[in-house]
Amino acid sequence: MNAKIIASLAFTSMFSLSTLLSPAHAEEQEKALNFGIISTESQQNLKPQWTPFLQDMEKKLGVKVNAFFAPDYAGIIQGMRFNKVDIAWYGNLSAMEAVDRANGQVFAQTVAADGSPGYWSVLIVNKDSPINNLNDLLAKRKDLTFGNGDPNSTSGFLVPGYYVFAKNNISASDFKRTVNAGHETNALAVANKQVDVATNNTENLDKLKTSAPEKLKELKVIWKSPLIPGDPIVWRKNLSETTKDKIYDFFMNYGKTPEEKAVLERLGWAPFRASSDLQLVPIRQLALFKEMQGVKSNKGLNEQDKLAKTTEIQAQLDDLDRLNNALSAMSSVSKAVQ
């Protein structure tokens, strides 16, 4: 990410003004859409959860909607980059990558079924483990095996990477052995005592109540992060405006009937709310904070190089702070007008 990307956030997060003001013109509407689904669980579990939702979307839009699965988050990002994925459910970190590298744009946000404004990253151990808190974990880490998340996962990688590791000046490589996997795989590995500790999140643990209740009973949460914003729904910017309008209308109105509410509840959600690329600002700040920590602790860099890199990162953080201040001011004015 660079300063140009940050500077353009406030504009790219909204619909193109030039598009809104330009004369109407004929567009070729997409005849089918591929919906990317990140691999938080096995495809076997995800497919029945998502099929009713995608079928409803297909009926509303009047075009075929195909589920697009990949073995990791990067597969969905790359799919969008090469126009193989049209819409996708991402975590915040993978959405940031899609926006920056794959011509993506956030337009909606998930809301937890209980109405929570987001979810939490957690560290889990087996219920029989003597480890009960973060201090226990840090003290014994060199003797433990660690199940880290997908490198593009917000709750499985970025958030614990900052709050657990960077803030305590340690690394995931400090463990006896570290492996990377999705949330479901990590949870089952801890339940089966194949790894000692792993990352996860509260949404996925809730899903285990249905998909693997006996395994859930084997888990113990030893750390919980600050709140993470709800997951973004992202489309390709170069979709036709006609298709975007239909997609947006579907998401903003879905979940009003008992049948639709039941479909969303199976996914762990309540009705969606509107969003934009601006919801990624806190995640951008977190990624930059983590990068700053890494530069400062890098023994391979001389002091001059460290200063240059940290100065560049700080400039990006300052840009994001100014953007946040502007958004807060705009929000205050909007509330005053109302």
Curated annotation (Swiss-Prot):
Gene3D superfamilies: 1.20.58.90, Periplasmic binding protein-like II (3.40.190.10). Pfam families: Phosphonate-bd. InterPro entries: PhnD, Phosphnate-bd. Keywords: Periplasm, Phosphonate transport, Signal, Transport. SUPFAM superfamilies: Periplasmic binding protein-like II. Its main location: periplasm. It is found in: Periplasm. Residues 1-26 form the signal peptide. It comes from Escherichia coli (strain K12). One of its GO terms (cellular component) is ATP-binding cassette (ABC) transporter complex. This is Phosphonates-binding periplasmic protein. The sequence shown is that of strain K12. Belongs to the phosphate/phosphite/phosphonate binding protein family. The complex is composed of two ATP-binding proteins (PhnC), two transmembrane proteins (PhnE) and a solute-binding protein (PhnD). It comes from the Bacteria. One of its GO terms (biological process) is transmembrane transport. Phosphonate binding protein that is part of the phosphonate uptake system. Exhibits high affinity for 2-aminoethylphosphonate, and somewhat less affinity to ethylphosphonate, methylphosphonate, phosphonoacetate and phenylphosphonate. NCBIfam families: 3A0109s03R (TIGR01098), PhnD (TIGR03431).
